[in-house]
């Protein structure tokens, strides 16, 4: 089976769904953010603070290139679609799944997730986060071969829909 790439805004469920989907398909799961932390040797918020978003996006692009050689379920960071080079890379995969949720649902998940510090959500208002989502939405849609709505759905329901659509 070819790689499956999960894209979507922060809080869409990419890591949660990626891990479970990989288990179901008996494939390795690669989380781009986790791999980036290992590569850069510090947390993403620390890296953002010290080097800025542009430097972070460069690291992200390099890692996406490296990981694209593996066959796995790949959970990406929410901003992976920002760079044109990344969008080209994403379009080269056969299975790119956009995990979509309403802005209200995303805000709820982001604010309730105390374990995950999201540098682009810290110290931003709800309105600013929604504006950020809206600025990326078309890029997610442009890169996706499949869109799955995750709003008010359990991980199991989402995975079952993905598996059903992969069979078709």
From Swiss-Prot:
Binds 1 Mg(2+) ion per subunit. Substrate binds at residues 33, 57, 78, 136. PROSITE patterns: SHIKIMATE_KINASE. Disulfide bonds: none annotated. Coiled coil: none annotated. InterPro entries: P-loop_NTPase, Shikimate/glucono_kinase, Shikimate_kinase/TSH1, Shikimate_kinase_CS. It comes from the Bacteria. It catalyses: shikimate + ATP = 3-phosphoshikimate + ADP + H(+). Its cofactor is Mg(2+). Transmembrane segments: none annotated. Mg(2+) binds at residue 15. ATP binds at residues 11-16, 118, 153. Its EC number is 2.7.1.71. One of its GO terms (biological process) is chorismate biosynthetic process. Keywords: Amino-acid biosynthesis, Aromatic amino acid biosynthesis, ATP-binding, Cytoplasm, Kinase, Magnesium, Metal-binding, Nucleotide-binding, Transferase. Pfam families: SKI. It is found in: Cytoplasm. It is an enzyme of class 2 (transferase). One of its GO terms (molecular function) is shikimate kinase activity. Its main location: cytoplasm. Belongs to the shikimate kinase family. Monomer. Catalyzes the specific phosphorylation of the 3-hydroxyl group of shikimic acid using ATP as a cosubstrate. This is Shikimate kinase.
């Amino acid at each position: 089976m070819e790689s499956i790439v999960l894209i979507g805004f922060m809080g869409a469920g990419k890591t949660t769904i990626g891990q479970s989907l990989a288990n179901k398909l008996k494939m390795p799961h690669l989380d781009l953010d986790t791999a980036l932390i290992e590569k850069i040797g510090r947390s993403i918020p620390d890296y953002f603070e010290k080097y800025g978003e542009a430097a972070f996006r460069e690291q992200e692009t390099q890692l996406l290139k490296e990981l694209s050689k593996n066959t796995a379920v790949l959970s990406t960071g929410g901003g992976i679609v920002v760079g044109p080079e990344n969008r080209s890379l994403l379009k080269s995969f056969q299975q790119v799944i956009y995990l979509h949720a309403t802005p209200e649902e995303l805000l709820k998940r982001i604010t309730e997730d105390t374990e995950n510090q999201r540098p682009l959500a810290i110290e931003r208002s709800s309105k600013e986060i929604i504006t950020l989502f809206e600025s990326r939405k078309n890029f997610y849609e442009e890169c996706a071969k499949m869109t799955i709505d995750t709003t008010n759905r359990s991980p199991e329901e989402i995975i079952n829909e993905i598996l059903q659509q992969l069979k078709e």
